[in-house]
Amino acid sequence: MKSKKFKILVLPSDRTGVSKFRSVDPHTYLQKMYPDEFWVDIKYDPPYTDDNWWKQYDLVHYHRSIGPDYDASKVVAKKLKKWGIPQVMDLDDYWLPTPDHPAHMMIKNAKVDQKIKDMLMVSQYVTTTTTEFASEISKLNKNVFIYPNAINHEEKQYIPKPTPSPRLRVGWLGGSSHIKDLEILNGVFGRLHRERAGKFQTVLCG
């Protein structure tokens, strides 16, 4: 008799960015590599109140929250625990950005930081990216594990295309939320230009 497949529900927080590397791709490859053992469903709008729908799964994985409705997500998380269905919460960013972050006040006013902490406390397991963040998370949930982003180095954006140059190239990549990080380099490139003019190239992306 053919054994029953282990059914996993994956609930990404968005359709790009972090969800690709920490929710969608890892589980897509899991099913691809072990098709006889795992079945993975990816859902962006879960039916919070349909108990029978949730009960069909053997494990639920979500990033930050089960869905955009944090209160409903917390209720579902407690039900999953009662039903004996393991749940794994993934979190890669601190729940409250620094005051210079564009989204700081929006998150603070909507109490999203507290809602994320509430989800951490009701989840059975948590996965994250670094030992430093894992240490912080462990103050709220001791069952925390560290996993790197699932990057497929065969995707075209990661395939190196070396371009010969006599210059030393320095690259920096960041978005609008990284302005304060960029300020740390204030004066560095001016000094490099004075001391190494024509010997280096700076590329800013973002």
Residue ranges and their predicted role:
Residues 58-59, 86, 125:
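Structural motif
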Residues 14-29, 150-158, 162-206:
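Conserved catalytic-core segment of nucleotide-activated headgroup transferases in glycan assembly
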Residues 82-86, 141-142:
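A short helix->loop->beta-strand "cap" motif at the edges of active sites that frequently abuts
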Residues 27, 88-116, 154, 165-166:
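Acceptor-binding helix/loop patch of EC 2.4 sugar-transfer enzymes
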Residues 63-82, 173, 182:
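An aromatic- and histidine-rich active-site surface loop
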Residues 78-82, 106-125:
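Membrane-proximal helix-turn-helix segments that form the acceptor-binding/catalytic region
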Residues 1-67:
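N-terminal pre-catalytic "stem/leader" segment of glycosyltransferase-like enzymes
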Residues 121-158:
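Donor nucleotide-sugar binding/catalytic pocket of nucleotide-sugar-dependent glycosyltransferases
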